[in-house]
């Protein structure tokens, strides 16, 4: 299994958080994109409490590194992961719709823990404008984090940054929630993205499906 190479996070310039492919080393981890246009019955959507936080783990918070916590969570959940560098880790996780590549990186200079959850998406060229319209609508509905589409790499990515200050530490429950929220959002809105692209459905219908899914699993 090939994982992203080590990156240099020194300085944490805007490029560190914006140039997603080069900096976080997000990989294509799937084959041909699934062309799902309908939403099958399913009983699973990860949500609050789906990922077990390591609240009872004995941590030395004085010397705690947030990526160490992520590694503990990945080990506890038996996810495939690679500790690319002291400040970066990459994981793979299987969802109901897709498999996801999740990368977390710590920028000490900005005191920010950044997360990117990506999955492959290769919509028809003539439906790209509809996809961007859907992205705008979905991001308006999202309280934390947001989606962006990297056309050249054919990847959809959910991005979120946990900003800390004054030497605050990222707690296990916070990191656990970051990962859970990323996968939950990807699972929730994947059908809507597929409906407006391969299904060529209108945006309103696609969003109703996503909202209905969210309420059915609340």
Regions found by a protein language model. Give the residues of each.
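Short, Lys/Arg-enriched N-terminal segments with co-localized hydrophobic residues
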Residues: 28, 33-51
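Ser/Thr-rich, low-complexity intrinsically disordered terminal regions
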Residues: 72, 76-120
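Short, highly charged C-terminal tails/helix-capping segments
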Residues: 194-218
């Amino acid at each position: 299994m090939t994982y992203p190479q080590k990156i240099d996070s020194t300085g944490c310039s805007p490029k560190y958080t914006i140039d997603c492919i080069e900096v976080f080393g997000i990989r294509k981890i799937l084959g041909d994109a699934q062309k799902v246009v309908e939403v099958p019955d399913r009983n699973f959507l990860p949500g609050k409490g789906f990922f077990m936080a390591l609240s009872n783990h004995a941590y030395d918070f004085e010397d705690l590194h947030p990526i160490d916590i992520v590694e503990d969570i990945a080990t506890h959940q038996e996810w495939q992961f690679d500790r690319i560098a002291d400040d970066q880790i990459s994981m793979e996780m299987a969802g109901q719709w897709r498999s996801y590549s999740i990368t977390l990186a710590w920028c000490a200079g900005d005191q920010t823990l950044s997360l990117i959850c990506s999955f492959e998406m290769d919509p028809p060229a003539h439906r790209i404008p509809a996809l961007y319209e859907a992205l705008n609508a979905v991001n308006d509905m999202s309280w934390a984090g947001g989606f962006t589409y990297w056309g050249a790499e054919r990847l959809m990515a959910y991005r979120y940054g946990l900003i800390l200050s004054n030497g605050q530490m990222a707690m296990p429950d916070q990191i656990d929630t970051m990962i859970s929220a990323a996968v939950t959002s990807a699972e929730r809105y994947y059908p809507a993205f597929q409906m407006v692209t391969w299904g060529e459905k209108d945006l309103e219908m696609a969003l109703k499906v996503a909202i209905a899914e969210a309420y059915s699993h609340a």
